[in-house]
């Protein structure tokens, strides 16, 4: 069954990205970034919709040129999830996407020009209630900080971040969040820990350039898991060299494992051994694929034998304990009279899980605004 997380989250200020609350105890938002050419409006819209389907709260889109800004206008008109525009160097692009309804600007004040240009972007953001994300990356530190520290260090990343924070402070702008990403787990974790002691603004978590689907998921889980367990973090992105949809899935799996935010089915399944009375691995894989559309939080245990099966089933919403030819079925911790044919488990379990999801959440829709 679902249990409350023991984690006490860091206190932070509240901002809004579109209608998604960030910080001050709001549910941790999961986001990704498109990897299509932004000027390919059709492909970008399709990818954003795919991300939204698996639960993305926010989607970031790179806007490197004015042509991309014009494409962003068309993209924004066709999607409902809040969009962050990722902008570097040309402050005029930030002003343009602000006209087109962007929900958040990802910039570094230090790389978009002089004080006058920074002020024009900040004034525009203030007038239109658009928050800003300051994004510091260990791979693109300012040259003077590289010279000062010799290599990326937590102190270097945080000093870079605080420079940008000071820019916004001087302009009396406080609607922003900050990230200090690095590809090294310990560098990223120590940077976020240090930054969390210095500012009250929301923190966006990420291990940048984490790697492919498997290695990147592991690295991100280790790094973000440490921070989240300490209560640090208000939004997150899992950076994978893979389909962005996988980033959202991994992000929710991390939050689910820490009992911070649950979305969809939490499958409790044994790794299988010679005691299994049915094919556990293929059963779980098939159910995960079939039930991706279920977002109602629930625990489903699928254990191939009677050694651990009953115990896990008794603390799950639904449970299966393998037995010869027919397996025992549990609901809300109680063994039911009906037994499931081991040759047709996937179809039988899918029907039961869908019915249970409907009971647990009649609307079959939980969103971050309602969770707040």
Swiss-Prot record:
Pfam families: GcpE. One of its GO terms (biological process) is isopentenyl diphosphate biosynthetic process, methylerythritol 4-phosphate pathway. Its EC number is 1.17.7.3. Pathway: Isoprenoid biosynthesis; isopentenyl diphosphate biosynthesis via DXP pathway; isopentenyl diphosphate from 1-deoxy-D-xylulose 5-phosphate: step 5/6. GO terms for molecular function: 4 iron, 4 sulfur cluster binding; 4-hydroxy-3-methylbut-2-en-1-yl diphosphate synthase activity (ferredoxin); 4-hydroxy-3-methylbut-2-enyl-diphosphate synthase activity (flavodoxin); iron ion binding. Keywords: 4Fe-4S, Iron, Iron-sulfur, Isoprene biosynthesis, Metal-binding, Oxidoreductase. It catalyses: (2E)-4-hydroxy-3-methylbut-2-enyl diphosphate + oxidized [flavodoxin] + H2O + 2 H(+) = 2-C-methyl-D-erythritol 2,4-cyclic diphosphate + reduced [flavodoxin]. The keyword Oxidoreductase applies. It is an enzyme of class 1 (oxidoreductase). The keyword tRNA-binding does not apply. Converts 2C-methyl-D-erythritol 2,4-cyclodiphosphate (ME-2,4cPP) into 1-hydroxy-2-methyl-2-(E)-butenyl 4-diphosphate. Belongs to the IspG family. This is 4-hydroxy-3-methylbut-2-en-1-yl diphosphate synthase (flavodoxin).
